[in-house]
Amino acid sequence: MIRSTPALLPHRLSAAVLSALCLAAAPVAFAETAADPTTLDKVVVKGERAEGYSVRKTSAGTRFDLAPREIPQSISIISHQRIEDQNLDDIIDVLGNTTGVSSTQSDTERTEFYARGFYIDSYQFDGLPTQMVQNWSYGDSGLDLALYDRVEVVRGATGLLSGAGNPSASVNLIRKHADSAELAGSVSVNVGSWGRTRTTVDVGSALNASGTVRGRVIGSYLDTDAQMDRYNQHKTLGYMVIDADLTPDTQLSVSYDYQQKRANGATWGGFPMLFSDGTSTGYDESFNASPNWTYWDTTSKRAFATLEHGFANGWKFKIGATHDETKADDKLFYPAYNDWVTGASYFDKNTGAGISPSAGFYNTERKVDAIDGFVDGPFQLFGREHQFMAGLSYNKRDYANYGDYQVGGAGLAWDPFSSYLNWNGNISEPNWNPLSLASEGTITQKAGYAATRLSLADPLKLIIGARYTDWKSEGEGADRSHKVTTPYAGLVFDINDTYSTYASYTEIFQPQMLKDRNGSYLDPVDGKSYEVGVKGAWFDNRLNASVAVFRIEQDNVGQSTGEPVIGGTGGETAYIAARGTVSRGFEFELNGELAPGWNATFGASRYVAKDINDADINTNLPQTTLKLFTSYTPQSLQDLTVGGGANWQNRIYYAVPAYGRIEQDGYTLVSAFVRYRISPEFSVQANLNNLLDKKYYSQINGYGAFGDGRNGSLTFTWSF
């Protein structure tokens, strides 16, 4: 058992937040002596418009192109430059370094992300909404970042643009474009711990003499083992995009990407954490709970197109469409060892008996078709200029899951072992049956949305809007439909040219499969987010800071009555709608260029989430996190960049009624990097992660998984 952390954490957190607030004010003094910020040098990476660690404008949250300080919600930008500095490979890496986001690793191929106490299931690709689910893993959390320029995260309820989801956050992945009219590109080779080798090629050029049609191709291949024995992963990525200026005011972009991951020795869940006497099983970081024949392979193919036209009066029309096909093929092993209700372990530390071998062979497939079009622009009313936007959205997701699940043991057809002690993964594979249909269905969302940004006075802006969603689910014997209106309201007051304060109210809904006593499905869970905060911006929005206080409420959450559904199937329990989880907390973030050549991001978050019985929820996730990363390029030695960071989280625990609870102390992960440009064409970069080699769990829920120990990599890049 891991002992809890000392009670000094609130004091440490307060000191850290005060220090961060002081840091946020520092640029005011800096601005008095610094050169005109518009003269600061910029780095251009392969034709892309670099913004350091921040962006000057974004359409995140509202579709309006606004500076971060003009948006009445908490947002985080993970830029291309930061992705490069930290050597972030995939969505797991990005969200693990994002303010206010925490995660739990279900197994080697599934990682679930949470914000403000709620599961994140709302994702967007260039603004087109979709939902990702983890019960049948399609590899979404492992999406490769090589084809994305940046990631934008809006925290809280985001129903205006997302449709159905949880009041946690929305993650928007922005693709790279063909924005170079000349031949330009790079080749990079990354080698590192556990036999890691990753090669990436990125080439772009004009496709006609005038440069109005441009193309870009990105390819990447990763081959790596892991700190866990008998695990290997291969990832292949191909991406191509064509951008065309059809007229000076009309742009067309068409892209296609292919991603394939092959994971051998994949786990399903984690390893057993407790023996039957309640003592720790004591496995180390290299332990793999799976046999040698397990694997988890995923393949995704995604076509995407956008058309945008700007009118002379300042209005804009944009439409985007995507078709996505994803398949997964996996053979997995699950070492069942405990009672699901009490957590009591059957695993005998002396004999190794008590592990019930379970195995699954699954083929799953998902198809997504989505289209979203909107207009936005200015209009005059009462002598003032305002903004308006309206759009239509359609999203259809078809899925089918096929599988064969087998339980082994003494006296059964598959009896691979009698003792789990001295486990080496060398056991027999079940004789699989033909795969049968486990589940299939179609989820469709049709929506219309609109919002206006009213200039009530020079310093005061009001954003109000709503989304009407027609949601329908067919299949799995549970056809359902809901028609939901989701409001949005935000008020922003400019204190001066640097600071603004805001208040917002946003909603989102989540359908549920529970029935009342008459057999009718309950209305969707309603997530309501209240938020107030202060934001600041310096150096033409190259540095942004925000502090927010929030409250999130869930209504219409199903609560069991203990009574049967009238006319229902045997054992079907009736539910009533009740108040659900309430989450309260605050967040702080400072992100961008503190001084010429010095970029940094610092985020602090704290929340407390309780259910209707006033009990903490998701106690295996940290309620308090601090995340820092910085990079510095000396003005006198601009070929050298150095940096590093630290992520800290507080104590977590998981209740095991039979023994008490499993606890993990708070811990800090430290990272560092250095990059040197040998010549205008060649550079080398070294990254070190978990510098102090901290041993920690990335999952504790009766089953365990370890986070990565100390590891490093070298990246050699040739640019042309």
Q: Model regions: which residues?
A:
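N-terminal Sec signal peptide and the immediately downstream disordered periplasmic leader
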Residues: 1-86, 92-100
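Short acidic/polar hinge/loop motifs at secondary-structure boundaries
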Residues: 103, 112, 128-155, 174-175
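Structural signature of Gram-negative outer-membrane beta-barrels, strongest in the C-terminal barrel
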Residues: 245, 366, 385-397, 437-554, ...
